[in-house]
């Protein structure tokens, strides 16, 4: 009886892994992007032909979803805040789209996923970010490109997920998010 139950459990686990291949690959980022995409479906995929040496860089042969949209905005839009280095030589890649400049990480600045960036309509405008029981204003200076990536312009990083507010260290500091929580953090945001 115990052997039958064990075999049944293994069969069910195998069925789940076959039905949901992302689970067997440990594809956490892809699952998280789908979970928070809010009706925004991938518009395509990028499959780089070569890998790069940084930890977060694209890997050859791996597929990365691209998005032309972001979830609809509300008075309290759910998003994932990520950490970005807006300075020259940082992981942000090229200068900011809105003003063609690099920014100090002591400035409260953000890049928004392609759909929220809205072809630059939010450039140089403030958004309000709420997290960790705090609220902060940050200026939109760049696009976190959800359509392109894995190239020099994008610091060899994958395309942005459709639900990202990519924030400078100053934003994280103002929200008093520190230690192991820095990197990715669930937030809400709105136009200010």
UniProtKB/Swiss-Prot annotation:
Q: Which GO terms describe its cellular component?
A: extracellular region
Compartments, as annotated in UniProt = Secreted
Q: Which Pfam families match?
A: KWL1 (PF24300)
Q: Which UniProt keywords apply?
A: Secreted, Signal
Q: Which domain of life is it from?
A: Eukaryota
Q: Cross-referenced PANTHER family, in alphabetical order?
A: RIPENING-RELATED PROTEIN 2-RELATED
Q: Which family does it belong to?
A: Belongs to the kiwellin family.
Protein name (record): Putative ripening-related protein 2
